[in-house]
Amino acid sequence: MNKKVYKTLEYNKILTMLSSYAACDETKKRCLSLEPITDLYEIRHLQTTTADALSRLYKDSGVSFVGIHNVHASLKRLDIGGALNTTELLRICSLLEVAKRVKAYGRSAMDNEKQDSLSGLFAGIEPVSALCDEIKRCILSEEEIADDASPELFKIRKSIRGMNDRIHAQLTKLMNNSTTRTYLQDAVVTMRDGRYCLPVKAEAKGNVPGMMHDQSSTGSTLFIEPMAVVNLNNELKELFIKEQEEIEKILAALSDKVAMNAAALEQDYEILSELDFIFAKANLAKSYNGVAPDFNTDGHINIRKGRHPLLDAKKVVPIDVRLGEDYKQLIITGPNTGGKTVSLKTVGLLTLMGQAGLHIPAADRSKLAIFEDVFADIGDEQSIEQSLSTFSSHMTNIVKILEKADDRSLCLFDELCSGTDPTEGAALAISILNRLHQYGAITMATTHYSELKVYALSTDGVENACCEFNVETLSPTYRLLIGIPGKSNAFAISSKLGLDENIIEDAKSRINDNDLDFEDLIASLESQRQTIEKEQLEINSYKAEIEKLKKQLEEKNERIDKSKDKILREANEEAYKILQDAKELADKTIRNFNKYGQGQAPMSQMEKERSALRDKMNDKEKKLSDIKKNTAKANHKAPKKLRIGDSVLVLSLNLKGTVHTLPNAKGDLYVQMGILRSLVNINDLVLLNDDVSPAKKYGGSGSKIKMSKSLSVSSEINLIGKTTDEALALLDKYLDDAYIAHLSSVRIVHGKGTGALRKAVHGLLKRTKTIAEYHLGEFGEGDAGVTIATFK
């Protein structure tokens, strides 16, 4: 690819930014030399690794790669039998510490997550912790080996300390001698050539026997090693030699261990430097909120909300650019400082960044094409040495572009063919654009020439664009508007700035009528565009509000459905429980009947328990009724159309009947239920199909019991021939069944006789809470041998 364009589009500045996020020196160099590539699959792979690293950064912060060192040279020396020094060993230790840290980060960042493109790299890291720990144990710094690096070194250094103490004691003894002290310049011990000496006055040289190792610059002081410590210094020197030999053994042993792990170290360095590079790209993307664009080889560009990465993100106005699909050339017109050049550079720079595997500062679903070459003629690139004019400089560059451009090229021109006669310049510009159009090159060009606007309007595959300008504020908005040619606004701006209107009108009269009409047409189109855009914003606002209300309604309906299902479920559970309790009560009643019928307990006890059971049954009946009302409310819709004779279920009574009259204005109508005709409201009815029983559809098993009861319970009971206890037990159960079956009244035949049975029956009726009133039968009803009881 043409490398000259890197500087023109400021791609090199992006690489400098990228290198600032790298930790390793080798990675920094790699960042600064990063170039765009043209292989689609490799580009997608690079974008994927950057995206996965960015995802990890957002999810689990980052990890430091500081401490990575290139160990290739050290490992190569080990191959030829050399040993490593402390600096090299500490760098290897540093590399292993980074490996351990990064390995842990890779594991924690992906806990409970699926594998990504970086998982293999993290898995390939081998920290070799034992080697790292051994190096840290033995080497304290580049200049210091630990005493306990080996037992022998510990022993030698202990001897050195002992010898030092002996020498210092001997020299101190000499200095404390009053005679010797007069020969010394200072009462201090010094070291020369690795041997302990005393500073002796030059004139007292013969008074202190020993070996002279040095003298001061003035010659007034001689540094003499007294004979009393010569042998001790010799022994100390031997100990230092032994110490160095032992240190070399320790370093050699560590070097051997490094050599044993050379393959792992090579792999760790390669992986860590690769991850350092990938995370540098991710951190760069994070700094400008970058995204991975979609790539194609069809020349289609669709940058959504693109921003120039070198401009202040808080101030830059995002642009939308579509190019290469419906049209292959985009001609941008408009006033200076309106953002035309920035738009050109943004498209070119984002293309280079994307093909280099870098995320671009744009919105999701942005699309970039892969180009074999990117050409740009932007700015004043004339050479003083070449003595070229502005026009000649640009034309020289354009000639080179025309020689190399093809259908896999992106060509960018700023003020194409400016700097010469406008008529000739416009003609040249159109011809150059036409040639590039024939090549199939994707082209963007900025211009002030009105002729190029006409060229774009009259040529297939060429589109106009402009950078919006606010005439009221005399400032550009920096928005790129595709499909609309730009207007110079010279007259409007001059008028706003106070230029005499007569001068402006005179200037207009000097313009060709066709040109003036064309400019007026552009102004009209721009006004219409702004109106349409404003209306579109309002429509979008309404649509957003409608979507919001729709979502709220759907959520409300969902809550209602869930509540309805919950009510039905709880109702069924409660109904089942009530029926179970009722069954147990019935069983207990039967057991008590058998028990008391056999005379095993007093009558008062039986009546007491019967009364308690009846109260419980009444309570269960009320609960079941409430549940059925709630169930009906949750599941019921009133019938829309009723005809006389339709089968219906009266929810409040849980009885099946037929429509006897049509509903009135209030929705009230008469329903015939057996011998009972009742006035009900239409909202209390459910229209039944002939093939669906009301019990099955609306009442569950409880409704089945009630319906069967209403069909089987007689309105009369005959107690003649029964003992008092038997009669009362039968009557008590009969009254419960009749009440449950919704009978309004019953006829109790007890006979006249002695009146004892009648008296017992009346006593039971008096105690029964469901009985509203009772009386002996009148003439024709059975007279005193019958009692008529009416339910509440």
Curated annotation (Swiss-Prot):
InterPro entries: DNA_mismatch_repair_MutS_C, DNA_mismatch_repair_MutS_core, DNA_mismatch_repair_MutS_sf, MSSS, MutS, MutS2, P-loop_NTPase, Smr_dom
Domain of life: Bacteria
Residues where ATP binds: 334-341
Entries under Pfam families matching the protein: MSSS, MutS_V, Smr
E.C. no: 3.1.-.-, 3.6.4.-
Record HAMAP family: MutS2
Cross-referenced PANTHER family: OS10G0509000 PROTEIN, OS10G0509000 PROTEIN-RELATED
Listed name of the protein: Endonuclease MutS2
Source organism per UniProt: Agathobacter rectalis (strain ATCC 33656 / DSM 3377 / JCM 17463 / KCTC 5835 / VPI 0990) (Eubacterium rectale)
